[in-house]
Regions:
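Conserved acidic carboxylate
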Residues: 10
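Alpha4 helix (beta4-alpha4-beta5 surface) of REC/receiver domains from two-component response regulators
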Residues: 64, 87-114, 120, 124
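Helix N-cap/capping motif at the beta->alpha junctions
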Residues: 32-41, 62
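Active-site residues of response regulator receiver
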Residues: 54, 84
């Protein structure tokens, strides 16, 4: 089986190291970016199988990168796991508000994980998304 490539976009160095280490020790090929601008560049270069994306980042934030991904036909089908300290209900509501007036509203991410992050939970989500399995609501 081909090793799956996962891009981690996270501004916090310690969290970036933690997530990439968890993924690599579980057999995934993980690369990391410190912000959305670098993340978009790596998506174009590496074509990852899945993206783990922090919502709150300075400069090119996670939501802005998410919007770029989901409105680009080349990348819109790459599964995205959003990470945030914000409750998922609050995030999904703000995503819906940002979509008002757009011809094609932004879809909800394939998964949303609240911080503090649990390695087991993240790996379970990654495994299911890469296998094309549905996630529990």
């Amino acid at each position: 089986m081909k090793e799956k490539n996962i891009l981690v976009v996270e501004d916090d160095l310690h969290m970036r190291i933690f997530i990439t280490t968890v993924l690599e020790t579980s057999g995934y090929n993980a690369t990391a970016s410190k912000d959305g601008q670098e993340g978009i560049r790596k998506v174009k270069e590496d074509r990852p199988d899945l993206i783990i994306l922090d919502v709150m980042m300075p400069e090119e934030g996670g939501v802005s990168m998410y919007r770029q991904l989901k409105t680009d036909n080349q990348f819109k089908n790459i599964p995205v796991v959003m990470l945030s300290g914000v409750e998922s209900k609050t995030f999904l509501h703000s995503l819906k508000m940002m979509s008002i007036g757009l011809r094609n509203p932004l879809p909800a991410p394939e998964a949303y994980v609240e911080k503090p992050l649990k390695a087991e939970e993240l790996l379970n989500i990654v495994q299911k998304l890469l296998a094309g399995e549905p996630l529990p609501e």
